[in-house]
UniProtKB/Swiss-Prot annotation:
It comes from Anser anser anser. Disulfide bonds join 6-36, 14-33, 22-54. GO terms for cellular component: extracellular region. Pfam families: Kazal_1 (PF00050). This is Ovomucoid. GO terms for molecular function: serine-type endopeptidase inhibitor activity. The record marks 16-17 as: Reactive bond 3.
Length: 54
């Protein structure tokens, strides 16, 4: 199972680096920062489906 450590999030701003991750909501996030901010917003219900685009 793929996991991402989001313990140091949320961050107020994310970089524009492109390293896509696919969330359990079937949405592609541009990078870990965007994904982790979404995880925090979802109260932990969002998880990583896999690395790369959905």
């Amino acid at each position: 199972v793929a996991t991402v450590d989001c313990s140091d999030y949320p961050k107020p701003a994310c970089t524009v680096e492109y390293m896509p991750l696919c969330g359990s909501d079937n949405k592609t996030y541009d990078n870990k920062c965007n994904f982790c901010n979404a995880v925090v917003d979802s109260n932990g219900t969002l998880t990583l489906s896999h690395f790369g685009k959905c």
